């Protein structure tokens, strides 16, 4: 498994190469898409990208937490968190890739 992290710049480079936009235009397009996803989530809307994933904002209620070092209880305030649920198509693609890699390793 690789430890590479894909960045905004990496995405912009792929758009530049595959779509034919300039690097500046590609970076602006990536930024526009990410901003729209963020804005939708801020408004409380779910973002569903077919065959990829669904992002949703979930409300978490107040609860009591505990400091793991001291054991002292402390309230955890209510908040909103973003959840990511991978689509079955993405899950299967990752599983297939993992199985193919395992098959190659076992035949070496």
Curated annotation (Swiss-Prot):
An individual GO BP term: regulation of translation
Alphabetic keyword roster: DNA recombination, DNA-binding, Transcription, Transcription regulation, Translation regulation
CDD domains named among the record's database cross-references: IHF_A
GO cellular component: cytosol
One of the record's GO molecular function terms: DNA binding
Quaternary state and interactors: Heterodimer of an alpha and a beta chain.
Job of this protein: This protein is one of the two subunits of integration host factor, a specific DNA-binding protein that functions in genetic recombination as well as in transcriptional and translational control.
Family according to the record: Belongs to the bacterial histone-like protein family.
Protein name per the record: Integration host factor subunit alpha
Gene label: ihfA
């Amino acid at each position: 498994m690789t430890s590479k992290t894909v960045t905004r710049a990496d995405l912009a480079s792929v758009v530049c190469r595959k779509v034919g936009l300039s690097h500046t235009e590609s970076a602006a397009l990536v930024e526009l898409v990410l901003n729209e996803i963020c804005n939708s989530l801020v408004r409380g809307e779910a973002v569903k990208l077919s065959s990829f994933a669904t992002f949703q904002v979930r409300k978490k209620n107040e609860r009591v937490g505990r400091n793991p070092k001291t054991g002292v209880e402390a309230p955890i305030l209510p908040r909103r968190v973003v959840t990511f649920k991978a689509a079955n198509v993405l899950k299967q693609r990752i599983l297939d890739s993992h199985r193919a890699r395992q098959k190659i390793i076992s035949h070496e």
